[in-house]
């Protein structure tokens, strides 16, 4: 366990990852001094795992915060941090993977990533990131060649580990049929209102660590919901345990054997979110949470197309829960 109280998880490749990370997807203060200062404050209060992506456009601010943290002595070396970034869909082509990773490293001012993830199981026509994706730009991903390029990035030392995001059991199976090295992480939405039972069981059987995002319902995001934070069940448990609803939700995810990333730019909540590892939910608590109605928060609508690989949400997520 780290000095900040966050347990370390050993991934199937052997590298160790903090069980809790700070998410960096933010629209309101993207690319601002406030964003950089929030990352710097997170390092100061004890966060050592940061989750970014080319699409978040937060890599440069995070890189500046890391450089400043080193200068201020908040950390002694870059090796104290675990940095994750993600390959955007327009770069999910065999010849573009390495250049995309190298661009992320330039943004972050780093020599290597700890974890590099494919952001979605879809490719787009090559080009700059755009908020509104033309439907005819959505393409099926060549899992074999793209994953081989991800493996090459790891072999070259630009990332210590590789994985995926938002992959269903079916997509994972397709990828692993030709992979030399299986993904070590699958980052997906998971919370008390989306248990992901089938996917969790599949990933566990294949030594893939689930990293949960939208653990608190992605409140504030365009697709966000108050279903988690306003849950009466979670509120009752929180009162009984002397914890916050956020802490109960995060603790539930951790007790399912998953790692997680959460985001807050508020210092008090940053500190609160770290305090989920020295207590447990009871069997009765877990039973109550198991009965919470289930619904997905995140949407794949922007990656659906009549001519693309996925035409409906159900097809994209391959949901059986």
Swiss-Prot record:
Biotechnological relevance of this protein: In yeast (Saccharomyces cerevisiae) engineered to produce opiate alkaloids, the expression of COR proteins leads to the accumulation of neopine and neomorphine as major products.
Tissue occurrence: Latex secreting cells (laticifer cells). Expressed constitutively and ubiquitously with highest levels in capsules. Restricted to the parietal region of sieve elements adjacent or proximal to laticifers in roots, stems, leaves and carpels.
Reactions it catalyzes: codeine + NADP(+) = codeinone + NADPH + H(+); neopine + NADP(+) = neopinone + NADPH + H(+); morphine + NADP(+) = morphinone + NADPH + H(+); neomorphine + NADP(+) = neomorphinone + NADPH + H(+)
Annotated catalytic residues: 56 (proton donor), 119 (proton donor)
Binding site for substrate: 119
Localization: Cytoplasm, Cytosol
Enzyme class name: oxidoreductase
Function: NADPH-dependent reductase involved in biosynthesis of morphinan-type benzylisoquinoline and opiate alkaloids natural products. Reduces codeinone to codeine in the penultimate step in morphine biosynthesis. Can use morphinone, hydrocodone and hydromorphone as substrate during reductive reaction with NADPH as cofactor, and morphine and dihydrocodeine as substrate during oxidative reaction with NADP as cofactor. Converts morphinone to morphine, and neomorphinone to neomorphine.
Full protein name: NADPH-dependent codeinone reductase 1-1
Record organism: Papaver somniferum (Opium poppy)
């Amino acid at each position: 366990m780290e000095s900040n109280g966050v347990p370390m998880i050993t991934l199937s490749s052997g590298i160790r990852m903090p069980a809790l990370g700070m998410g960096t997807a933010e629209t309101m203060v993207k690319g601002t001094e406030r964003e950089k200062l929030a990352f710097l404050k997170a390092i100061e209060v004890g966060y050592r795992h940061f989750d970014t992506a080319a699409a978040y456009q937060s890599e440069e601010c995070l890189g500046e915060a890391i450089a400043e943290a080193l200068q201020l002595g908040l950390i002694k070396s870059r090796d104290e941090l675990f940095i994750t970034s993600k390959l955007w869909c327009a770069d999910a082509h065999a010849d573009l993977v390495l250049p995309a990773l190298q661009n992320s490293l330039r943004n972050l001012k780093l020599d290597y990533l700890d974890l590099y993830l494919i952001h979605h199981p879809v490719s787009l026509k090559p080009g700059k990131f755009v908020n509104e994706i033309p439907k005819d730009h959505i393409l099926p991903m060549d899992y074999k060649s793209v994953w081989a390029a991800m493996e090459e990035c790891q072999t070259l030392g630009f990332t210590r580990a590789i994985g995926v995001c938002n992959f269903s059991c079916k997509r994972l199976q397709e990828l692993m049929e030709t992979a030399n090295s299986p993904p070590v992480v699958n980052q997906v939405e998971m919370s008390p209102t989306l248990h992901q039972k089938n996917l969790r069981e599949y990933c566990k059987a294949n030594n893939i660590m689930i990293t949960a995002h939208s653990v608190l319902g992605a409140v504030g995001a365009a697709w966000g919901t108050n279903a988690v934070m306003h849950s009466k069940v979670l509120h009752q448990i929180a009162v009984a345990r002397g914890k916050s609803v956020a802490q109960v939700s995060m603790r539930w995810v951790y007790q399912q054997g998953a790692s997680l990333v959460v985001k807050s730019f508020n210092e008090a909540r940053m500190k609160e979110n770290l305090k989920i590892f020295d207590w447990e939910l009871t069997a009765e608590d877990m039973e109550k949470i198991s009965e919470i109605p289930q619904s997905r928060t995140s949407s794949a609508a922007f990656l659906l197309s009549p001519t693309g690989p996925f035409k409906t949400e159900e097809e994209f997520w391959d949901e059986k829960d």
